[in-house]
Amino acid sequence: MAAAAHDPAGAYDLLVIGGGINGTGIARDAAGRGLRVLLCERGDLAEFTSSSSTKLIHGGLRYLEYYEFRLVREALAERERLLRLAPHIIWPLRFVLPHDEGLRPAWMLRVGLFLYDHLARLRTLPGSRMVRLRTSPVGAPLQARLTRGFLYSDCWVEDSRLVVLNAMDAQARGAEIRTRTGVEAARRQGEGWIATLRDGASGRSETVRATAVVNAAGPWVSETLGGTLGIDSRAAVRLIKGSHIVVPRLYEGEQAYILQQPDTRIIFAIPYERDFTLIGTTDVPYEAEPGPVAISPEETRYLCDCINRSFARRIGPEDVVWSYSGVRPLYDDAAANASAVTRDYVLDVAEADGTRPALSVFGGKITTYRRLAEHAIEKLKPYFPGLAPAWTGDAPLPGGAMPGADFDAFLAALRREAPFLPDETARRLARAYGTNAREILRGARSLADLGEAFDGGLTGAEVDYLVRHEWARTPDDILWRRSKLGLRTGPDSAARLAAHLTRGRAEAA
């Protein structure tokens, strides 16, 4: 894909290590303030933790139990902001919280929801209220023993697409984004840093210079800090594995459920990709290498048991059509319980004689990524005199500049412009790309004009767009991170997609 013009001297203001939500968010913020930015990700964007979340933009209702009022307030403010800036990939969800006798008392739930409603200074989503589950349609999927509960609001997000959109906007503002490129080593030299990069495809090495380094390596933050950068730090990361399962749709309706468990944890059941239900997450301490991880049989059984405590329809491991796991790099606050570890973030700056800073990101949650990025650049501001002010709070993400942030109006307009699209395909394109969907459809007057047809409504035109503009190189990049069409793609279609990508690379060579 086309990259921003490369500085022939190999010099940058900021080298960002890591292409997850924090790395791309920081790169975007920095580039928009006028810094020369290089972001390196050794795999694909959002390949690990950032595509393995519960896919919620939320204040974190359960964090109130741990008195994290500042975190919840900040997250609620960001929820409102992001809903406005990316209405295609973020949308409101109504949650059902059943009162489960013997667990948290009803008064505690009421107090928590009252705080949740009122910690948000600005609120566009409906507030909480009590609901009688035996007479309300939202109670129909639940067991008869659950007679009352509460409704409240939060938001859904396409997590991996949020990462990609931040990278796209960073590049549009001058950043250079390199995927499949690892930072092998970086050391202070002269007035800045000198780093050795290795291209994962060609194996070629390259040396670049940067004034400052941001270590946003996620689960590898400590390894990168001590190994790649050669810096000792008192800040530590605590790795927590979280797993989710996807099953055929458990219930009718667009509401999600938040289910209390006897071990004090909560589990979400969320409508997913029209025909499925997403269930998660687990919280398991993790001490192995934080690479690709998979759900364990014990985690699968646990999540099924959690559903079977509350839903009338029972599920078992045989019902799972897909699962995913990720390792969350939380700041180690010495909490005894994995679920109690803070989701707040710590930004650790190591410098030498007041220069050559390296900022490392510990912890954080996807909801507050924009604020984290803003905070990170503010911490680096003393090293860049004349840096432009913060700007991301009012800037839509790519595809999100819809009048009034009105997704439904945009979808209706897209259907008028491309009446040949099946309704579901039009909705999927509008959700995934927002106003950029028009780039994929440019010049098309029929489905045939969009090129080769793959399963799930994917077309050659969409694939080519993803290769040109979104750093997609492999079928997995497209089927599991740029979309979730892997749930609808058979082996024959996947093989044709791989062949299409191979032909495209050969033609571009």
What are these regions (language model features)?
Residues G10-Y12, S202-A212:
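Core beta-strand elements of the Rossmann-like FAD/NAD(P) dinucleotide-binding domain
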Residues S153, D159-R161, D169, T228-I279, ...:
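C-terminal catalytic lobe of FAD-dependent flavoproteins
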Residues M1-L14, D29-R33:
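Extreme N-terminal leader/targeting segments of oxidoreductases
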Residues G18-G20, R42:
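Glycine-rich Rossmann-fold phosphate-binding loop(s) that bind the pyrophosphate
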Residues T179-W193:
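A conserved short coil-to-beta-strand element within the FAD-binding core of flavoproteins
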Residues K55-V138:
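Dinucleotide-binding Rossmann-like beta1-alpha1 core, especially the glycine-rich loop
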Residues N215-G230:
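Flavin (primarily FAD) binding-site architecture
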Residues A31-S51:
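Glycine-rich FAD pyrophosphate-binding loop
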